[in-house]
């Protein structure tokens, strides 16, 4: 029998039992010397309660399955509604913490970090050992710009060395917190550990080059990007970072080549046209620069934000 048919059957039975009068019904006693006797009112209540619990359990399971399916489709509103219904059915169940955690993650996905922090904090008051929840709260704090509270949660996590979390994820988050606090060497230490654990990790290499540049080491950042692009010549972020550094060194033709490649690989990124237009102006190619600025406007960047560049044409 399919799940939906079973649910319909359970609910029909529950409705029937609820509507029945509490007057005597026939029940078979299967105990020793079994006999036929009348069902009492108390037994009727117990039977109805059992059916209701069964129906609620079936609905709860259905809500959870459909909720996670909705999450996989990025249908946040649908998932939220289903998880909230599951909580209403069994608010004190051991699994309720998982439901609440996912509701908090839905708020995270909506960039409603204040609501997510509220949900995660309520969970951690009762379950301080829930490392995934603490990790998500630290992430929210960082998104809110509160590096101090993010650091406090991260210190707890690093001290616990949780096996439920990937160490690389912890190192990435701590590096991001250090970057926010302008502790660039601390950030680099964590990112270098990520590379020791995962030598081909492109994100760690990119972030290391950014940390080098922020730490006043632009040549080291450029060298790192050169190595990365030898292995990954079509990594758009690396191309853009290298072009930015080359432009900073006054190597505008080299920067232009990298922007050309980046735009070929990711033509939908409007900001790339603005970056290339700035370099084209330095190269004296005003006609090409105008085309790039117009393309950036066509792709959604407000013309008012580009007035200073238009004035250079």
Spans of model-derived segments:
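Alpha-helical segment of the N-proximal tetratricopeptide repeat
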Residues: 59-89, 105, 109, 176
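Helix-start (N-cap) detector for alpha-helical repeat units in TPR-like alpha-solenoids
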Residues: 60, 94-97, 131-132, 164-169, ...
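Canonical tetratricopeptide repeat
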Residues: 65, 98-102, 136, 173, ...
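Register position in tetratricopeptide repeats
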Residues: 72-73, 106-109, 143-144, 176, ...
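Structural marker of alpha-solenoid helical repeat scaffolds
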Residues: 89-92, 126, 160-163, 197, ...
């Amino acid at each position: 029998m399919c799940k939906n048919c079973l649910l319909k059957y359970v609910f029909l039975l529950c409705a029937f039992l609820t509507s029945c009068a509490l007057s005597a019904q026939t029940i078979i006693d299967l105990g020793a010397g079994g006999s036929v006797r009348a069902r009492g009112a108390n037994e009727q209540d117990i039977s109805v309660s059992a059916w209701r619990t069964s129906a609620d359990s079936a609905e709860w399971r259905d809500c959870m399955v459909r909720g996670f399916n909705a999450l996989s489709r990025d249908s946040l509103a649908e998932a939220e509604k289903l998880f909230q219904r599951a909580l209403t059915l069994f608010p004190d169940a051991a699994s309720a913490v998982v439901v609440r955690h996912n509701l908090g993650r839905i708020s995270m996905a909506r960039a409603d970090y204040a609501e997510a922090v509220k949900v995660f904090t309520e969970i951690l008051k009762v379950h301080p050992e829930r490392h995934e929840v603490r990790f998500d709260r630290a992430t929210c704090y960082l998104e809110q710009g509160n590096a101090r509270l993010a650091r406090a949660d991260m210190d707890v996590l690093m001290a616990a060395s949780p096996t439920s979390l990937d160490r690389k994820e912890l190192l990435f988050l701590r590096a991001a917190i250090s970057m926010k606090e302008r502790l660039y060497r601390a950030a680099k230490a964590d990112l270098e550990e990520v590379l020791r654990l995962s030598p081909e990790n492109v994100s760690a290499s990119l972030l290391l080059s950014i940390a080098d540049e922020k730490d006043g080491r632009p040549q080291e950042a450029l060298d790192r990007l050169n190595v990365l692009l030898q292995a990954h010549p079509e990594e758009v972020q690396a191309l853009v970072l290298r072009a930015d550094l080359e432009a900073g060194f006054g190597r505008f033709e080299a920067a232009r080549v990298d922007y050309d490649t980046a735009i070929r690989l990711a033509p939908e990124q409007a900001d790339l046209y603005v970056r290339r237009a700035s370099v084209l102006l330095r190269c004296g190619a005003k006609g090409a620069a105008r085309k790039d600025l117009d393309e950036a406007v066509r792709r959604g960047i407000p013309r008012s934000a580009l007035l200073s560049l238009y004035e250079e044409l």
